[in-house]
């Protein structure tokens, strides 16, 4: 869902279409290597930079997904410059906060291009996204690297309404909205995860587009179009057809509504919609553990 959301959102912005303009993709967290490898394989003119702090993870990924060996970069000093890389995957071992700060400075000096997408798919030993990577301070660094109209895409653990996981997700959504721009959520096949995507505002707005967020219809169509064109192994539109627009009112609340659909806000049906994990699904998971 992360790759699907990013590919479709960039496709819908003529200035950032990865199929036509190459571009720069930054991945915070290597994980299994599947995400950066997929982006590099399907968008061969794009520069895909990965920041990973754990050498064990990096070593485990070598030999998989065509990342054998990845281009090793850093540790970052003033040079080499983040962003000044040939197409393909480059790996930087080190702290993500330091990496993003130096990447932002490089952009501001004019030594590196802006990024079309920043992916955040990093988890600690306890299976949680480190809190400093979802703070306003870190997201501001991401925003400094991001091109206008570009997106920050985050993979998070989900939970039932009112759960610790869900409250944290709501806080992160509020931070994203405050720092980067309008937020859209995407459910995944199994509700244990949810994807958040924030689109950066443009200084001059978005022209004739009344809302900077994309509708379900637009996302689904763009996803299916790009999947067919680039021969994805799966239908990106399938992952995007249940997108939700998020409204946080500055962190005072958290509401999801079907992206681009007009529904009666007083309807009880609206309150049952969204990406929150159902209580029944959560109970089933607990019983299996």
Over which residues does each language-model region extend?
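The AdoMet/dcAdoMet-binding core of the Class I SAM-like
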Residues: 1-179, 191, 289
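SAM/dcSAM-binding transferase cores
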Residues: 22, 109, 184, 193-289
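Flexible loop residues that form catalytic
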Residues: 123, 188, 201
């Amino acid at each position: 869902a992360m790759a699907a959301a990013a590919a479709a959102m960039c496709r819908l912005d003529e200035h950032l279409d990865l199929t036509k303009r190459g571009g720069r993709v930054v991945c915070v967290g290597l994980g299994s290597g599947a995400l950066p490898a997929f982006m590099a394989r399907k968008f061969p003119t794009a520069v895909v930079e990965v920041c990973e702090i754990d050498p064990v993870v990096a070593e485990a990924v070598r030999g998989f997904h065509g990342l054998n060996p990845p281009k090793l970069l850093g540790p970052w000093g003033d040079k080499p410059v983040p962003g000044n890389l040939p197409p393909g995957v480059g790996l930087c071992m080190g702290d993500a906060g330091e990496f993003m700060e130096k990447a932002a400075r490089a952009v501001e000096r004019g030594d590196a291009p802006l990024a079309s997408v920043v992916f955040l798919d990093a988890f600690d030993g306890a299976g949680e996204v480190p809190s400093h990577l979802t703070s306003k301070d870190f997201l501001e660094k991401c925003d400094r690297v991001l091109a206008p109209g570009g997106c920050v895409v985050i993979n998070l653990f989900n939970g039932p309404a009112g759960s610790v996981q869900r409250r944290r997700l709501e806080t992160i959504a509020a931070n994203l909205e405050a720092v980067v721009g309008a937020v859209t959520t995407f459910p995944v096949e199994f509700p244990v995860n949810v994807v958040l995507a924030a689109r950066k505002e443009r200084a001059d707005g978005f022209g004739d587009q009344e809302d900077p967020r994309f509708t379900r219809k637009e996302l689904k169509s763009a996803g299916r179009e790009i999947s067919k064109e680039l021969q994805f192994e799966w239908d990106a539109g399938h992952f995007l057809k249940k997108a939700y627009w998020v409204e946080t009112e500055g962190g005072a609340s958290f509401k999801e509504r079907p992206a681009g659909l007009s529904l009666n806000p007083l309807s009880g049906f609206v309150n049952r919609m969204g990406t929150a994990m159902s209580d029944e699904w959560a109970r089933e998971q607990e019983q299996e553990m």
